[in-house]
Amino acid sequence: MFGLSRQPPPSALASCGDGLAFNCARATDPLDDATPYGLSTWLPASYLLRLPVAGATHDRVASYALGASSDGAGPAFGGATGVENRWTIDGAPADQLRTGAADTRIPLTFLDGLFVSAGGVSARDRASTGGTIDARLRRGTANHEVSADAWTQLTLAPRDPPTAIGSYAVRQLSQGSRPEATASLVATGPIGAPGSVLGGTAWYAAGIAPTLATTGVSWRAARQVDGDGDGVPDGLPGDLALQAIERTSARTLDYSVPAMARVGLDRGPHHVELTLIGEAARGSQFLANATLPAAGIDHRTATGDAIATWRGTWAATHARIQAAWHHSADRETAHDASAAGIPQLLSAYVPATLPDDPLLAAACDDASAADPAKLVPNCPVAAGAFASGGAGLLTDVTGDRPSVTGDLAQRLGDHVIRVGGTFEHTRLATTSSFTGGEQDRSLAIGELSRRRFYTGTCSDDLAQPCDAAAESKLTYRTTYAAAYLEDTFAPSPRVAIDAGLRWELMWVGPHLRFSRELAPRLGVTWDPLGGGSSRLWASYGRTFAMLPAGLGQTVIQRDATFDDDGTSRTHDAGAAFTVAAGVEPIVQDEVTLGAQIALAGALRATLWGQGRLVRHGLETTAGEFGNPGDGAIAATRETEIVAFSLEMRKLAQTAIRAGVSWGRTVGTWAGPYDPRQGVNLLQGSDWDAGASNLYGPLPTDQGGRAFVEAERLGRLGGLDVSVATRLAVGSGTPRSVLAETSDGIVALLPRGSAGRNPVIAQANLRLSARWHGLTATLDIINLFDRRDPVSLDEVYASDAVRPISGGSYEDLVFLGTDAGRAARRRTSFLLPTELQPPLSIALGVHKQF
């Protein structure tokens, strides 16, 4: 643990078995479950825990695998976004039911390791259009062992992005530093009596790793001034001069409690494992432009998996049957108890009466006799709305996904024949409600509209009834099924040729149903050095996108609401987008080529190339959900990646792992996540106003990336000490130029043609020492406290403008509106919207019993 144990001398190369050992490049037996026809990285927990990771969970370090990058949604592979991966726990699906991102977060102390595949699939593999991440949990040990860890961590306050010249907000929100403390206790060992009775070896593994954290948030309220009385706010056309009104603050108390309980029985060729793993957590989120009671919403989540697995391993036969149940629940409540039972008011002004903030109301009252700036509004709400009263919309989400999987592999001479199948059914239920039973909206003083949910019937005719309801309940269901047949032919111990066909079914509700997804997959690998110490491989594979249940709000149903202002009524039945006739599933074709060599347990080198083409992207257009494009411009994504890595161990107490990659991703379809829009559930804005200028480098175009991980062991003053570091640098994302028009967001210039955002670099450092069996560590994340922009505001103008087809950045100075005047550039254009996370320091201790 933590890399302070003495390293044994290099030994002779043994059979590579499953191919996971450092001195192995591939499994030596074609009967093994792992696919050798692509780029897979085995990240042992014993290795990850030697790096500066503090109390990280597995979803935070999956991007350490070769071929991986990272976007705002998670680790990204092969040009895909961070919500296109498949996440599994010991082979059982554990993706988030709503979006497809990681759901059950597993502490590294619970893991045996992470098996990450960046590309290259065989018919047996459950895959989508991204990567696959399998978290392999700790098993029992021959003797009773207890591993105890504790960390205390402080993350500095993040820097607020700069505000645009001339912009104003009534209240601005800032986040303070975040102290947190984590403890982890993991016990493993044998279970004597049951194992003896059943004639085998029984074992257990159990762990708990609670984290307690607190974060301070503060609001600064200010008003405009007009000291010279000229009717123009002071400071314009530059930064506004503001007069402070008040500062308010709150502090959250957040927690996370992951827990694991496992038992297993090994009896001859039979292996049975029963697993319960999950997490209970609490967190808060806040609005900026709101009174304190109306600003906060608390989230209480519970996520977990129950997994039962039987494996049979005979000399010529491997079999597996696995049943699993994934559950998640997210309950929202008002952060302030006083905001739980009253309606929220969203207004285009600051009300003159605010029971929860009378000081702000008085300072912003333009009708007050004490108003010091009578010719300008004190507190204009220029964009969005000001929230007061209750907490507003609260949504509870509960999801369940039972699944069953079966696999059989049989050796027949030089062939290994595999057959198998899987079935997953997801139910996602949402319950939405407004505090106080309604949400009030006002565009002007004296005008008020009440928004409520309804069930049954409703019309815009006030004389007709409308069945108002206190809450709206919706249920979304998805079904995924697959079956495969695969043949691996090994004409010699060093060569294996694989061919297979996978059939998949993907249904989302009653209208979006793909039942004939056929995926041929081919692969060949050659071990020129023998013994599993090398491999050359090539593969071709087709995959189809896994569609999450959250897509139901796009294609099944949304909440039904109506607005009533006393004189008129407007209802929204919550109709989803119509699924286009003849819609095709998202299909991806992939080719990989690579070489890997592992020598004497001290050196491993990998060279890898990957090409992917996504066709039939799914997205919303005007009132319809389908495959956008008119035939000439279709929704596609094309990726090419080349990567190289080198790992060295046991060389003068030094371990080094380094990698470099270059990638290109172009097309018209960004996928279900976009840095500007977030997770959009395939109803983004790209295709709403046409396809002009959509083709170009996509946000997942990774450019150049490099990383170095290193560890050095030694002795200092009688102590075993070590220094470990991880350095990473990568190109910024491609930059586009957009416009906000009455038709929606349009691309003024070809996508990604305005250069790239700044390079992102980060250095992490760990110092550790061991004394009398106790290991102390100091981790520094983002050592140099770099705060470079991660994303910029790409909206150039908010005006009636049209795309400059095939234009360049220099053409923007000539941009005009439909009315013939020059377009006005927004002062927020190219200002940072997100910065790198700040420096974080963690002190840890570890003890093995």
Cite the ranges covered by each PLM segment.
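Repeated loop/turn-to-beta-strand initiation elements of outer-membrane beta-barrel proteins
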Residues: 194-195, 202, 269-274, 282, ...
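C-terminal beta-signal and adjacent terminal beta-strands/loops
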Residues: 717-720, 726-742, 768-849
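Periplasmic N-terminal accessory/gating domains of Gram-negative outer-membrane beta-barrel systems
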Residues: 2-139, 169, 184-192
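Gram-negative outer-membrane beta-barrel transporters
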Residues: 494, 606-740, 844-846
